[in-house]
């Protein structure tokens, strides 16, 4: 398995642990350094990829991307957004190239991996190179991820049908019920991502993959060989859309029943009485906020009767109320599953959102970047959440959102409806993910699920050759009909006129 950081690793680790329980031997390729991954604590065989970069440099780059995505991009014109995205894409590609080089150029590592005779490779399509390693080892591979920006990888490399008229592009924050202007925005988002991905990222990686494999190929061709695509979503909060046989929703695979809280934490929760508690976290990637924003948030939290558990490692806000307690870490799943939890204030990360759905907890969303605006847009459309824009948020707007979610019973009812749908599945998400991985291992692939779209050129895929042929036929018929009419007109009409004159 090729590991990525943060939520990507959290989900992959759950799958790997289940596979290990079923008797499979696991080896994980881990870059060093990593921001969240500690390769000394990973309970599997580990191959560390040594990089010539420090953890501090990675954190600095991450903070720059987070700030730009959360606060700069929403204020820029679309052409400036395109420029910034190209800039971030190139930096992201540079980081991926470092990791890939450390694996591909390590002959001893590749020899060990070949000698191990693995049955399958689990990879993340956002971390280029997992599929290249699988190709070099001549083994099938399965992808696990949430989505790519604008669904560009799924559309271009997997052939996933994505009509822009009702399938909102990822990171757009749109729903499936779009106005004309929103459909225009969605169409332009797809176009912009196609241009950026094709012209500023793919060409470089096409050349790299061709050089490594010793034959002319493209990264999309190699990605398209994925046997299964395990997507961290599900129909409980996803909008209906076309799908492919080798795509499977496994959202919430990490969710589980709540465990009892530590004694001190349980005492704090019980002290809330009938008012209950609110759980607040902006995830593992946001370590702190500006003093102004943290005081604004603390002031709003101080005005609700509920007790608040706030995961926050920044400076203690001056406006922090007696009902609010700060924690460096909280047992989030166990708190969301507690009967006294009334609401969840979240950035909208997929993992936390699915834990809230699993336990039926309504949400106040403060989306920042990546998949978060999309996630919050979905649960908001389902009536289980309200959203607040961190850039323009005020104490009163956050307070109003909290009171609405806590006091309006419809939010809780809709959250419970999503929870019931999530639990009413023929197979649990984790079991479904493991089933398909083992299916690919048993059958050495799943090519019978692979659509023929991979074998078509782009103009064949859109039937443009058929359209051109039909238009040519119509034009030919019109041309011949016109010529025939002119011929008969000249042959008979002019002859008749000539006889009359005689």
UniProtKB/Swiss-Prot annotation:
Principal location class: membrane
Record key words, sorted: Endoplasmic reticulum, Glycoprotein, Glycosyltransferase, Lipid metabolism, Membrane, Microsome, Transferase, Transmembrane, Transmembrane helix
GO molecular function, a single term: glucuronosyltransferase activity
Gene3D superfamilies from the UniProt entry: Glycogen Phosphorylase B
GO terms for biological process, alphabetical: lipid metabolic process
EC number, UniProt record: 2.4.1.17
Superkingdom as given in the UniProt entry: Eukaryota
Listed transmembrane segments: 466-481
Subcellular location: Microsome membrane; Endoplasmic reticulum membrane
Family as reported in the entry's similarity comment: Belongs to the UDP-glycosyltransferase family.
Purpose of the protein: UDPGT is of major importance in the conjugation and subsequent elimination of potentially toxic xenobiotics and endogenous compounds.
Protein's UniProt name: UDP-glucuronosyltransferase 2C1
Source organism of the structure: Oryctolagus cuniculus
């Amino acid at each position: 398995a090729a590991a990525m950081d943060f939520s990507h690793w959290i989900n992959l680790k759950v799958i790997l642990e289940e596979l290990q329980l079923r008797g499979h031997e696991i080896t994980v390729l881990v870059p060093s350094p990593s921001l969240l991954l500690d390769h000394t604590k990973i309970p599997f065989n580990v191959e560390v990829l040594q990089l010539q970069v420090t953890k501090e440099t990675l954190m600095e780059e991450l903070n720059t991307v987070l700030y730009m995505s959360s606060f700069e991009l929403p204020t820029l014109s679309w052409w400036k957004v395109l420029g910034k995205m190209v800039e971030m894409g190139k930096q992201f590609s540079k980081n991926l190239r470092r990791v890939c080089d450390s694996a591909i150029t390590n002959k001893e590592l590749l020899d060990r991996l070949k000698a191990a005779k693995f049955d399958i490779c689990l990879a993340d399509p956002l971390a280029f190179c997992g599929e290249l390693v699988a190709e070099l080892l001549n083994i099938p591979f399965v992808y696990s991820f949430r989505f790519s920006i604008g669904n560009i990888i799924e559309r271009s490399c997997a052939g996933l049908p994505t009509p822009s008229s009702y399938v909102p592009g990822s990171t757009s924050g749109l729903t499936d019920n779009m106005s004309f202007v929103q459909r225009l925005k969605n169409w332009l988002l797809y176009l912009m991502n196609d241009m950026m991905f094709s012209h500023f990222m793919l060409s470089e990686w096409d050349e790299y993959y061709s050089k490594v494999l010793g034959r002319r190929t493209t990264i999309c061709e190699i990605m398209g060989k994925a046997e299964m695509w395990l997507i961290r979503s599900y129909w409980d909060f996803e909008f209906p859309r076309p799908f492919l046989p080798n795509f499977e929703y496994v959202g919430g695979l990490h969710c589980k029943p709540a465990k009892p809280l530590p004694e001190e934490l349980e005492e704090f929760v019980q002290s809330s009485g009938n008012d209950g508690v609110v759980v607040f976290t902006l995830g593992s990637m946001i370590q702190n906020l500006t003093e102004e924003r943290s005081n604004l948030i603390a002031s709003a939290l101080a005005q609700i009767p509920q007790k608040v558990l706030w995961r926050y490692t920044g400076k203690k806000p001056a406006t922090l109320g007696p009902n609010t307690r700060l924690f460096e870490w909280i047992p989030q799943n166990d708190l969301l599953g507690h009967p006294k939890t009334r609401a969840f204030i979240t950035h909208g990360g997929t993992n936390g959102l699915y834990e809230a759905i699993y336990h039926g907890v309504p949400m106040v969303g403060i989306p920042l970047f990546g998949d978060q605006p999309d996630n919050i847009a979905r649960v908001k459309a389902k009536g289980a959440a309200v959203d607040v824009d961190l850039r323009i948020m005020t104490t009163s707007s956050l307070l109003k959102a909290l009171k609405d979610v806590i006091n309006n019973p419809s939010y809780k009812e809709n959250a419970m409806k999503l929870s019931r749908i999530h639990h009413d599945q023929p197979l649990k998400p984790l079991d479904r993910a493991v089933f398909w991985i083992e299916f690919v291992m048993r059958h050495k692939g799943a090519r019978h699920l692979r659509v023929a779209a991979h074998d078509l050129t782009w103009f064949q895929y859109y039937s443009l050759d058929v359209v051109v042929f039909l238009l040519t036929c119509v034009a030919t018929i019109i041309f011949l009909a016109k010529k025939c009419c002119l011929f008969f007109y000249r042959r008979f009409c002019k002859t008749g006129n000539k006889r009359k004159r005689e």
